[in-house]
Amino acid sequence: MKRLILTAAALLCTQAHAGAQHLIYPLETAVIQDRDDALAYVQSRYPQTGTLALLDTRQSLLGTHYHFAPQNDAGQPCEGAIVVTTDRQGQLYRLFNSLPDDTADCVLNLPLPPRPHTLLSPPAGEIVQATMTVFDPDPRTATGLALEGDHADVDDIVIPASAYQTVTGIEVTRQNGRLYLVNDRVMAVDIQSMAALETGPEQGLVSVADGSSFAFTRQDTAFRDVNAFYHLDHSLQYLAALGFTGVRALFTAPLKIDAQGQNTNNSTYLTDTGILAMGVGGVPDSEDADVVLHEFGHAINYQLVPDWKGGDSDAIGEGFGDYWAGAYSFWVQRDRNERFELDVFANWDGVVGALKSRRSLNDQEARYDPEMDYRAHVSVNGTLSDQLWSTPLFQTLKQAEAVYGEAAFDEFNRVVLEGMAGMGFGMKMHDLARSTVDAAQRLYPQKPYAQWLNARFKHHGILRDALVLAQSNSALTVTGKNQTELSLALIQSGASALNNVQVDLAMPALNWHQVVRSELVAAGAVTRVNESVSIPASLQCGETLSLNAEISFSQDTAQQPVNYQQELTFTYGVPVLSQPLQHSQQAIPDARQINQNGKILLGEALVALNVPAGAGLVSYDFAIQLSLSHPRFSDLKVTVRAPSGRSVTLLNYQSFPLPEKTDTFTMANTAGLSELLGEPMTGNWVLEVTDRVTGQSGKIHSWGVGAVTGYDCSQTGTSTDPQNKQTTDNPAKPENSSSSGGGSLGLFSLLFGVVMALARRRQF
């Protein structure tokens, strides 16, 4: 076994990512029973913090969270936070730290005072049960019908009777012979006046005679109050059923909602007054449970995190609201054979009428840039901020439901809510993603929720391994007598230096094992690694090889170590296709901004390849070879279009840490390629590369399509028939292909070559 020591001098660096990690998992143990213990611990660990003020103490399913805010010399609150999190036994578990370096000149974070307003509120009385008529969750989902209607006037849309549901046992208040929409959880109010709000119509208090039901339809304005009241009450009861009750209760007083609170096509949770004000422009928002529950999602955010502000919190809040609404629509349809538009948020309010605004819960092209702050409803580098957070959550919920059925809803919703507990001012998506994966592992260690979440967050670039090994070429060639050249790179992509690094590498097929150790690996370090390795006599040309790596490091010497595994796959020998490669050296134009408003014109490169007659049909041995270079692969989408017009995406804005990539895409390692089975090979094939982010350009070096006829495993260019090789590609493990760009490890002797990665900041 070789032992390789990385020296600090060999790993020169620049900062790769601008965003620092706010989550800290201390090595030391401490018992914290109350706010005084928490404050004493913080001041002992961070003596330079100065004066801290306790904002609040919150309890969640897994422990207690003490939220502190920094203050300046005048006692005014500053932007920043430190949250001390303990487990259920009061043992220190984690810190969230976004404290400013200096509070003398800090940016103030003053609480917003309640704006002047007047409300009409229902009276107190006796709690009784009533019957209501509602949309559950909306008329399109309830019926599975489009119901597009007349775009000019939504009031003319014909709603079938089957769109309405009768619900019973709903708690309301009885007073003086009438029933009002108020109970211990929800209060339907009427905003009569409010500063800085374009208030909606004054509908008064909705009530019915004792013994009657709230049986309205959408032609009655009272239906809006009833529908919103029901869905908000149902969701609040669901929170309690998940375990957020007693000392863990998120809401301790009735939540106020005005179903016609705004005269615009917009709804808002007013944080200063604690009121949900629903809009009436276009389709009245209260008719769509998605919109009601989305706004309720904002209220949940502020109850879980008292200083929900700064960083990516705006976009996270929008994404969580979409998720919370989508999860309920999914639950309503859980027993249906055919589910209606699961991946669409607001598919009633956002679809019908002249004012359309629906969002996707399945934006697989959304990618995260840690150097940017994500606001609400904005596009960053081609990614809508709301969808960037909702997509990994909702798609993991679908994955969980497919495996565990109805039980997955409660379990996964607990994970999502618990993940937010303990966050603080200035949280970034990668902070919350890490916390959510952590919550999944702690709540359900026997189920793969954490693994699934981790994979989806990595797909979107929200989570990234701080230390990765990457290969620029997936094929191992023969470089000398019984020798192959392994060329890889060790990349430190974190925002700060890593301590006590150890990488255990193993490639069993080559009888090779190494351990790489370093006390310090600086941020942004890229170390090129090359080694000639002997080829065992038993190795067959065309065989698939795996390189496994176990990685361990600490963010600093006072934190718990991070441990994870990576894997790379190689092919021994270069695959030979039935059709010759096209060597194009075609430039990939950079995207460019074309006006003052930040509108982006995509950069596009098209390369055609003609396959002559007699080439046969696409079969299971079909492959696409591609070699291209680009400083930032996350800018690129690479698609191949067959002569029939059917297309397959090879790279989809996925991050890749090296500037060059040569790979062979096969049925086994590329999702979607099997859709081309049976297609004629003859005709024009088109490679299309799209760049959606300004700042970098690249080049297509070569590409080709065809059946794999053999593997070139010699210096003379002879090839081996794939039918004679001993080991073939494993179709059960397509995620291990290097085309994923995720990177596993392979490292041999160290011939250091340092690449400086300059930090960048782009603004849209």
Give the label of every model feature segment:
Residues S738-L747:
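Juxtamembrane/start-of-transmembrane alpha-helix segments at the extracytoplasmic/lumenal side
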Residues A18-V292, A299-F320, G326-V574:
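Zymogen propeptides/activation segments of proteases
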Residues L469-Q471, Q582, G743:
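Disulfide-bonded cysteine-rich modules in secreted/extracellular proteins
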Residues L463, S538-Q540, T569-S737:
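Loop and turn regions of beta-sandwich accessory domains that flank beta-strands and are enriched
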Residues G746-F764:
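A cross-kingdom C-terminal cell-surface attachment/processing module
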Residues M1-H17, V754-V755:
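Gram-negative bacterial Sec-dependent N-terminal signal peptides
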